[in-house]
Amino acid sequence: MSEKKSKLLILYSTVDGHAKTICEYAQTKLKKDKDIVIASLDDDSEQKLADFDEILLGASVRYGFHRKNVYEFVRENKEELLKKKTAFFSLNLTARKPEKASPDTNPYIVKFLKKVDWDPDLKSVFAGRLDYPSLNCPNRLAILLIMAITNGPKDLSKVHDFTNWSKVDEMIESIRKL
């Protein structure tokens, strides 16, 4: 008789789709071991957290902040989250710098978790992707200015992917063991 799979809810909040890409990658890697439902925080369909054993929340940062729906989700579901095994990852370009690539040193994940007063069982941070060609002109210029100040990439014709997929795989293995 096989062991019953745990139920994992994977939720994401994304601006440009990369948080979704990472969550779908995690789903693919974990589907043999867990029963998984994946959904966007932007979807109208509300998942009942009580139906799941574990929750992974992935969220991107834009202009220094996680999206409003991430703050709202954690605040509105804090009581239920505290009863579950939880994992959270933040996706931000600041994490491309080694000194800001850990959950303890990345200012955006530190600030977010403090503000919502949540301490997930597993925390990760990834540098993500900068897709200049898909940005509209005002966003492209704003991010170009930020990259100029922070010594980041300035080639507007390219997609710059800083995702450390080995770190993503490490997070997935940790989730497998939750």
Feature locations, PLM:
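N-terminal beta1-alpha1 ligand-phosphate binding loop
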Residues: 3-33
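FMN-binding flavodoxin-like domain, especially the glycine-rich phosphate-binding loop
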Residues: 3-4, 29, 33, 59-178
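Short hydrophobic segments within beta-strands
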Residues: 10-13, 39, 89, 126
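Glycine-/small-residue-rich active-site loops that bind phosphorylated ligands and cofactors
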Residues: 15-18, 44, 62, 94-96
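Generic recognition of short, well-ordered alpha-helical segments
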Residues: 21, 50, 68-72
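A short beta-strand-loop structural module common to alpha/beta enzyme folds
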Residues: 33-45
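A short, aliphatic-rich alpha-helical micro-motif
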Residues: 49-50, 81
